[in-house]
A protein has these predicted regions:
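OB-fold and OB-like single-stranded nucleic-acid-recognition modules
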Residues: 3, 7-185
Length: 185
């Protein structure tokens, strides 16, 4: 769509005439899904900048293992990238499709999902690098496009794939699983 292409190319976006009833966190996540580096500004009806947004997440951040449901992958993906201090060292469990990238090391793959921010034309593949540990000895597992349930410790590393710092998930367990009812989030 025209709007999605504009957001992908923009450095900043301003939402004006915002009210307390609006889900500003949802707007922010939608924009960040299209353009991770975009600066977002919210203004109230008087034109004053609103500092902070309600960034509550739909999963328990206090749990020993953060359980990300199939529908909440997109929220987690963006929040994990945007708030490294909240996630660094935490353990997460989620379902994703394994993608093999020849640029990655043999013990690495990408845990990915397709996300749609606006309409079918805007579907994009997103994911984070997963490092397999000594517990997972088969170099070919998981196979390309195999659906897996991953439990991993979240770390942050400087990586070329991210053009800087980004989440790298150190796998504790990887289990083959059924694909989700809705493959696109």
């Amino acid at each position: 769509s025209i709007m999605a292409e504009s957001v992908k190319a923009a450095e900043s976006v301003v939402f004006n005439r915002c009210t307390e009833e609006m889900e500003l966190g949802s707007f922010k996540r939608s924009m960040k899904a299209l353009n991770p580096n975009i600066d977002i500004i919210f203004e109230d009806v008087s034109g004053n900048i609103i500092s902070g947004t309600n960034d509550t997440v739909p999963y328990d951040m206090e749990a020993d293992v953060i359980e990300v449901s199939d529908n909440d992958f997109g929220v987690w993906f963006i929040d994990c990238r945007d708030r490294p201090k909240a996630y660094d060292g935490r353990v997460v469990r989620f379902k994703a499709q394994a993608l093999r990238d020849p640029e990655l090391k043999e013990n690495e793959f990408v845990a990915s999902r397709q996300v749609m921010t606006c309409c079918e034309d805007d579907i994009a593949l997103v994911g984070y690098i997963v490092k397999k540990t000594d517990v997972i000895t088969d170099p070919s597992y998981p196979a390309e496009k195999e659906w897996v349930m991953i439990t991993a410790k979240i770390t942050y590393e400087e990586r070329d794939e991210y053009n800087g710092m980004g989440p790298v998930l150190v796998a504790e367990t990887i289990e083959t699983t059924e694909k989700p009812k809705m493959e696109i989030v």
